[in-house]
Amino acid sequence: MDLTPREKDKLLIFTAGLLAERRLARGLRLNHPEAVAYISAALLEGARDGHTVAELMHIGTTLLSRDQVMEGVPEMIPEIQIEATFPDGTKLVTVHQPIA
C-alpha cells in the first residue's frame, strides 16, 4: 500500500485519536498529544461526514472538557488547526480554545 505523506499523517492522527478515545473510555485524563489527536481526528471525520467548516469550529470546542484532560493541558492548546478534506476541496479548520 503506497500512501502519500499527507495520507500517512492522517492515519497517524486517526490512530492516536483512537488511542485517546479508548483512554477516555477507561476514565483516564488525556495528556497534550492525546487531546490534540482526539480533537483533530474528530474534525477530520466530521469533514468526511459532510459538516461545514463553521460547524466543525463549533464542534471542536465541545469535544473535551477540563475534567477530561490533565492539569495544564487546556492552557497548552490555545488553538488547533488542521487541513480537512471536504466534498469541495481541502480547507483549514481552526478551533480556538478547544478545551474550555
From Swiss-Prot:
Q: What is the lineage of its organism?
A: Bacteria, Pseudomonadati, Pseudomonadota, Gammaproteobacteria, Pseudomonadales
Q: Which reaction does it catalyse?
A: urea + 2 H2O + H(+) = hydrogencarbonate + 2 NH4(+)
Instruction: Give the CC-aspect GO terms.
Output: cytoplasm
UniProt lists the family membership as follows:
Belongs to the urease gamma subunit family.
Source domain of life is Bacteria
For this entry, list what GO says about its biological process. Answer: urea catabolic process
Please give the name of this protein: Urease subunit gamma
One Pfam family per UniProt: Urease_gamma
Its chief place of residence is: cytoplasm
Location in the cell: Cytoplasm
